Amino acid sequence: MDLSIFFAGTAGSIPTPRRGLPALLVRRGGDRILFDCGEGTQRQLVSTVGLTELTEVFLTHFHADHWLGLPGLLKTFDLRGRERPLTIHGPPGLQELLTLALRLAGRVKFELALVELAPGQLLERDGYAIAPFPVAHRGAAFGYVLFEHERPGVFDPEAAVCLGLAPGPEFGRVQHGETIRGVIPSQVMGPPRPGRKLVISGDTTPCAALGVAAHDADLLIHEATFADEERDRAAQTGHSTAAQAAAAARQAQVRMLALTHISSRHPARLLRVEARAGFTNTVTPRDFDTIEIPFRENGEPRLLHWDAGAPEQEPGTGAREQEPSPEQEPGTERSADTVA
């Protein structure tokens, strides 16, 4: 079962020529789950992976850079004749916000459910679950954790034969949890194997809840709006520095840290250097890049660039990332973002 994250938008509060507003598309098997939907998200998708039939949408909070692309996306689905129901999840206030937005943009004909979540609520899905957790931003704001259920351990056919089971259907039945002629599954199966775990911080300043949610995650996608020189401003606006994101990743013992919500004030290269001083396996995805998360026995998460061939292994890191060109465009140096 594949699990990957497509970075549809990685900018901070203002888009740049190279980065669109926040949006992440999580792909697991046939499920397509969108986390946040900044202005322009539908074009980001149309120009790359296509305007997929989304399974669900999750909003982290209601600042405009994280949701303003949603009404247009819903209208496009409607114009294309979507019939499949769609559920949008978010913090309290979701229903009021989107009801008003659709009143202005025009209602849709397909079934649309607006679900306001509470911290700690567990949404069970086929083989995995999603849960919101509170983060420290301005107003109601969530991060999200997506974690897969445990998988059965590795089957030991030699042990099964020694216990009297015959190769064939009996092997299959005991692997599916059935006791066969006194042989119970635990006698022929190794310990359960963990599923994969993805954590999305949303906009936040450092907080304990994120550390708890991110513990032992395969991938932590954490905002990094500011460089360390502006950590005071980060605290004032409810955001994080790259170094603070790295500290969260290190304390939570995650496998990979991906920085996003990149402001035009700071080159991504600088943020990456600051973060790697505290957490080596840090990457800074660009728009349209993908991170694939394999099962742990199959290797480490890896970053794949949209406009490059096979990823290169950087010396001394577990991060499979090619060095991008300098991030800032002419005329954007140290631009004064209004932080949302």
Where are these regions (language model features)?
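Conserved beta-strand hairpin/beta-sheet module of binuclear metal-dependent hydrolase folds
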Residues: M1-G50, E83-P85, Y144-L146, G153, ...
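Active-site-proximal loop/helix segment associated with metal-binding centers of metalloenzymes
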Residues: T16, D126-A213, L219-I221
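Active-site metal-binding motif and surrounding structural segment of the metallo-beta-lactamase
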Residues: D31, E39-H89, E111-E116
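Active-site neighborhood of phospho(di)ester-bond hydrolases with catalytic His/Asp-centered motifs
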Residues: F35-G38, T55-F62, P91, V199-T204, ...
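Metal-dependent catalytic neighborhoods of phosphoester/phosphodiester hydrolases
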Residues: G69-F77, A101, H266-R276
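A gly/proline- and charged-residue-enriched helix-loop-helix capping module
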Residues: G93-A105, L114-L117
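Binuclear metal-ion centers of metallo-dependent hydrolases, dominated by the metallo-beta-lactamase
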Residues: P119-G120, C207-E314, T338-A340
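Short, basic, low-complexity termini and linkers enriched in Ser/Thr/Gly/Pro
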Residues: A310-E323, G331-T332, A336
